[in-house]
Amino acid sequence: MLKEIESIMTASNTEDLKKQLSKILGNYDIPHFLYGIRIPQVNKQTKDMIIEVYPQKWMEHYMKSNYIEVDSVLHYSLNHNLPIIWRDDIFTASQQMREESKEVGLEFGISFPIHSVTGENGIFSIASPVGKAVNNEAFMLTSTLLPYIHEKIKDLERHNRFYPNIPQLTKRELEILKWAAIGKTAFETSCIVNLAERTVVYHLTNIMKKFKCSNKGQAVAFALTHKVIQL
């Protein structure tokens, strides 16, 4: 297992990571996987990222058919923490999608919900046309590797269009933001940190500019989501 973890953590880019995952899972007769994540941005916006080795025609058909709206496994994963094994009876709202996915080799699978402490929500699925491949060994392998996969993708993608760059705050800005996070006004904070109220407002304004937020509440939410500060 350490060898597999090392190959994930030393991947040089996303394509290299896909190659390493394909090799690892391929050794267990699992040719398909999909990592899909919704990433919080500033101003309560989100961005979706998908990294997958799925049949391309199926992905195109899935998107064109808007199956994302009826995908029972996806909806389960966004609202639960425990993995789910694909069975026909769980696809009550998406039976047509289920039958079509079987035809392209996505018959047997397990999906693992992703709910990160930094606010990301998503899913990691493994799939195979071979029923015996999706077994206890594959389950334990994926359960073990998933935290490393998620952190590696965050590391690789942090500086591109998906993950927002987290601006650095000064020690004073961090101090003032922490007081703001627990509900202190600029005046109250000025009394606590022994600064003029206008100086506190100045620092809060700089924080909002750095985070590209339009108000103090958004700046606090962004900082908490991305672990810039902790309560």
Residue ranges: model-predicted function:
Residues 115-128:
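Sensory-domain boundary capping and coupling elements
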Residues 128-139:
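Regulatory loop-to-helix N-cap segments in sensory/regulatory domains
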Residues 155-175:
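Regulatory hinge/linker segments at domain boundaries
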Residues 173-180, 219:
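Short alpha-helical "packing" element that flanks the helix-turn-helix/winged-helix DNA-binding module
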Residues 185-218:
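Recognition helix of helix-turn-helix DNA-binding domains
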